[in-house]
Amino acid sequence: MKRTYQPKNRKHKRVHGFLSRMSTPNGRNVLKRRRAKGRKKLSA
């Protein structure tokens, strides 16, 4: 049986990257929360 996670860099960036986070209000909320929490890495 094939494993479910077949990583692709382009897909990963497009779905979870910084620009995609910034492009929606909810994504901005995600970044805001992660900044408040003090995450070293904000997005993928």
Swiss-Prot record:
Residues 1-16, 30-44 have a biased composition (Basic residues). One of its GO terms (biological process) is translation. GO terms for molecular function: structural constituent of ribosome. Keywords: Ribonucleoprotein, Ribosomal protein. This is Large ribosomal subunit protein bL34. The lineage of its organism: Bacteria, Bacillati, Bacillota, Clostridia, Eubacteriales. InterPro entries: Ribosomal_bL34, Ribosomal_bL34_CS. Belongs to the bacterial ribosomal protein bL34 family. Residues 1-44 are annotated as: Disordered. GO terms for cellular component: ribonucleoprotein complex; ribosome. The keyword Transport does not apply. It holds the Pfam family Ribosomal_L34.
